[in-house]
């Protein structure tokens, strides 16, 4: 009986320890190891194929700010805008000219984005709506010359009048013309001023312009980015070190940028946003480099979330306050002079794109309140305008995400150009975009049945074993308690036999009790049939 209790206690304790060690230590490590071997950019793997050509489109939304009082604004009035959108596009991503470097464990490739207008999702918008915006060529040209080449203002003003006859500070055109088909630029004039101005188009300095023939160009915000090379990347494949998977080594064949007045701001941090390493820590954040703004941005953990019943973590980001963060001072025009820093929640893109453009969150969400006060019609809120990513750390899978960014013009009055001399100094919103993804069941099921099913089985197994082991240990403890608490009295066989004999004898007649005589009490181990012993026992 004692041996059985010890066996039960030992077995239960062993199961308990096994459940703890295997369930919380061994199994997760095995799972992480298996994932790390599968999630690499090694040729021939499923992950490599999905990464090289995304088999589903991302959603790409464009919201444009239509200026409803352009004449008033041109004379110094406060802008009033009306948001129109979303114009919905299917964005397909693919990579080409892939070259592996086995020694360095890197892969080089060119990124390409293709936008296809989704008429059904955009309805009732068609793309043919007339939009009024700050003139995308006249205003930037005038502001740039005033800031950097004021001595050339007279020449540039004459050139603008030739190339853009009858142009105003604001331009009304169809949405598709602004963003994809293009605004016509006529460089056919033989005037010296016009030829000097058109040089920037012929040399390719205006990246958004496409040459149609020998004298004409088409300018659009996104046309040149559609189905064209978005830059050459070199990233780690993650075969030798899975923690480095996707991290950018070079962009445009350079190990760092030469855009900002500070090494820290010129670094490539993170991935190209199409892949992340598995098994990251929550506090690491999700970092990605965005060529459009020449900057790496990091999303930070916000809260726990879920997607189709699967647990995930919600990450978010904003542009921060450049003047308040010493690490971001290199995004100021002069890092030593904080007055040259952009307002809170914005980023000066002029060193990156060469024009007076500013980036921000949509509707200046989390920006300086003055930005919102300067323009009527803005209504920032977290639901519609915050950046978010629902991310699963163990597999490195983004379940859903919305990357949102607004582009603005840094407007100021230009004395040398009649159409712009009365403008207010403010940051004028132009449009904002959202690039997002929501994984469908085909791909969420891959995660669910390869990762979460294993985790659920492990959880069920370890808790079952822990429960059984606790029941076993409690049962063993109860049995030990009963053994120690019980009074186990056993008489020798001879005494039991003699006692039975006495019990079977006829009862003697009642005699008068002698008060002074002690009562005869049977004493264990004493032979009561012996008169001498009985006599000693009485006295």
From Swiss-Prot:
Which GO terms of type biological process are on file?
cell surface receptor signaling pathway; cellular response to pheromone; detection of chemical stimulus involved in sensory perception of smell; lipid homeostasis; pupariation
Q: Which residues form a coiled coil?
A: none
> Cellular component per GO?
cilium; cytoplasm; dendrite; neuronal cell body; plasma membrane
Where in the sequence does glycosylation occur per the annotation? Answer: 66, 186, 213, 226, 440
The segment annotated Disordered runs over 500-539
GO molecular function annotations of the record: scavenger receptor activity
Species: Drosophila mojavensis (Fruit fly)
Q: Which UniProt keywords apply?
A: Cell membrane, Disulfide bond, Glycoprotein, Membrane, Olfaction, Receptor, Sensory transduction, Transmembrane, Transmembrane helix
How does it sit in the bilayer? Answer: Multi-pass membrane protein
The organism's superkingdom is given as Eukaryota
Q: Outline which residue ranges sit on the Cytoplasmic face.
A: 1-7, 481-539
Q: What is its main location?
A: membrane
**Record family assignment:** Belongs to the CD36 family.
This chain's protein is named Sensory neuron membrane protein 1
- Localization per record: Cell membrane
Question: Can you tell me where the transmembrane regions are?
Answer: 8-28, 460-480
Q: Which cysteines are joined by disulfide bonds?
A: 265-330, 294-352, 332-341
Q: What does this protein do?
A: Plays an olfactory role that is not restricted to pheromone sensitivity.
The residues on the Extracellular side of the membrane are 29-459
């Amino acid at each position: 009986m004692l041996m059985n209790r010890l066996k039960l206690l030992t077995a239960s304790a062993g199961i308990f320890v096994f459940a703890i060690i295997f369930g919380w230590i061994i199994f997760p490590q095995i799972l992480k190891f298996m994932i790390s071997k599968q999630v690499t950019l090694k040729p021939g793997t499923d992950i490599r194929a999905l990464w090289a050509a995304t088999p589903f489109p991302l959603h790409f939304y464009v919201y444009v700010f239509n200026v409803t009082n352009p004449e008033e604004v041109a004379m110094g009035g406060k802008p009033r805008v009306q948001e129109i959108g979303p114009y919905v596009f299917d964005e397909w991503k693919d990579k080409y000219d892939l070259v592996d470097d086995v020694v360095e464990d890197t892969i080089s490739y060119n990124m390409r984005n293709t936008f296809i207008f989704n008429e059904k999702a955009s309805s009732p918008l068609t793309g043919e709506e007339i939009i009024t915006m700050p003139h995308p060529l006249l205003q930037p040209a005038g502001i740039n010359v005033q800031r950097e080449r004021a001595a050339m203002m007279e020449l540039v003003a004459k050139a603008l009048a030739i190339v853009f006859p009858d142009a105003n500070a604001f331009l009304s055109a169809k949405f598709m013309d602004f963003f994809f088909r293009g605004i016509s630029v006529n460089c056919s004039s033989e005037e010296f001023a016009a030829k000097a101005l058109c040089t920037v188009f012929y040399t390719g300095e205006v990246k958004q312009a496409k040459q149609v023939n020998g004298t004409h160009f088409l300018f659009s915000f996104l046309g040149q980015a559609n189905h064209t090379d978005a830059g050459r990347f070199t990233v780690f494949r993650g075969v030798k070190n899975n923690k480095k998977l996707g991290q950018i080594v070079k962009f445009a064949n350079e190990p760092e940028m030469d855009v900002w007045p500070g090494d820290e701001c010129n670094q490539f941090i993170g991935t190209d946003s199409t892949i992340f390493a598995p098994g990251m820590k929550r506090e690491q954040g999700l970092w990605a480099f965005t060529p459009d703004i020449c900057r790496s941005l990091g999303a930070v953990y916000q809260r726990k979330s879920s997607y189709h019943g699967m647990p995930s973590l919600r990450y978010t980001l904003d542009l921060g306050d450049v003047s308040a963060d010493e690490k971001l001072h290199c995004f100021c025009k002069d890092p030593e002079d904080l007055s040259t820093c952009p307002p809170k929640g914005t980023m000066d893109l002029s060193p990156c794109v060469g024009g007076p453009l500013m980036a921000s969150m949509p509707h200046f969400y989390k920006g300086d309140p003055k930005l919102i006060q300067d323009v009527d019609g803005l209504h920032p809120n977290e639901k519609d305008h915050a950046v978010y990513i629902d991310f699963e750390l163990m597999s490195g899978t983004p379940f859903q995400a919305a990357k949102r960014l607004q582009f603005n013009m840094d407007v100021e009055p230009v004395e040398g150009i009649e159409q712009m001399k009365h403008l207010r100094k403010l940051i004028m919103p132009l449009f904002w975009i959202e690039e997002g993804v929501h994984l469908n069941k085909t791909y969420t099921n891959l995660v669910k049945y390869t990762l979460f099913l294993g985790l659920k089985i492990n959880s069920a197994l370890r808790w079952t074993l822990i429960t059984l082991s606790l029941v076993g240990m409690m049962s063993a403890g109860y049995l030990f308690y009963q053994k120690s608490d019980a009074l186990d009295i056993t008489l020798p066989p001879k005494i039991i036999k003699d006692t039975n004999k006495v019990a079977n004898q006829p009862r003697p007649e009642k005699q008068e009790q002698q008060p002074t005589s002690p009562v005869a009490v049977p004493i264990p181990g004493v032979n009561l049939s012996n008169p001498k012993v009985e006599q000693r026992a009485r006295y």
